[in-house]
Structures are given as C-alpha cells and as structure tokens.
Amino acid sequence: MSYQDITEIFKNVYISNWYTSINPIELQKHNIKAIITIETRQKTQDILNYYRKSNIDCLFLYLNDLPSENITKYFDISYNFIDKHIKTGDNVLVHCWAGVSRSSTLIINYLMRRYYVLGGTSKCTKCIFKSILNHCQIKRPIINPNDGFKNSLIQYYSKS
C-alpha cells in the first residue's frame, strides 16, 4: 500500500494526503461525496470548482501542524460534518498535507465522541485514546498526531 492512497479508517470515513484529495480517479474509485481539508494553504478556485462539479461537499479548515495549535476549535464542526454525511451513507475523506497528524486527529476526535462519549463509557480517556489511535494505526501505520494534538484530545475528553 502506498500512503499516497486513500485509506479507509472505518465505514464511510477515509484519510489521505493532499495530492490524493485532488485526484479525480481516487475520489471516484472510493465514491467520496464529502471532504474535510485541514491545511495551511488557501483553497484554490480550481479545486473548489472540481469539487462542486463533482457534487462533493467540502469543509476547509486552516491549521498548522504544530503542537501549539488549537485544533480543538475544529472538533465540533468536523464532528458534525462527518456525522451528517455518515448518516446519509456518504463517504467522507479527511485529509491534510501528509495524512498523518491533523486529519487523523479529527478522525480520532470523531471516534472518541461518537463511540465513547456519546456511548457513555466509563473507561479512562487516555485508554480510549490509545485504543482508537491503535485502531487507526493498524489501518494506516503512518498515522501519528503530534504531541500537542494528542494532549488536546485527552484533555478535551477528560472534561466531558
């Protein structure tokens, strides 16, 4: 497997790098209907036009891959976007530059909220995080949120 490819992390949710996110063949092959881009570059009109022509719903979030960045400000909007599309059976692609840190953090956030917080589990937050991270890394071994994002996830859900 090349990690430029799209990787399915769980049903209807995929992760990739930036280059794959603009590859029409890959998007069609995986029937991607919604995309979250979490990047530092501004969206280009060509990409927006392609997504619109292909009836792909997109959410653009701007964030550097630095431990000091506040990724939690995007937890609610990304969760709601993914959840809305999953409920209608759409395939969602979440990507950043490399498909390693920012995008994986948003997917882990979704899984933590959906299956543990809303599910009412009594497990410790750190254990839940490690379990979900392990699942994601089995699917895509290069997944590795930076230390700041890891801490943000644990702290955010420790308060819930």
What do the predicted segments below correspond to?
Residues 91-108:
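A phosphate-binding catalytic loop at a beta-strand-loop-alpha-helix junction
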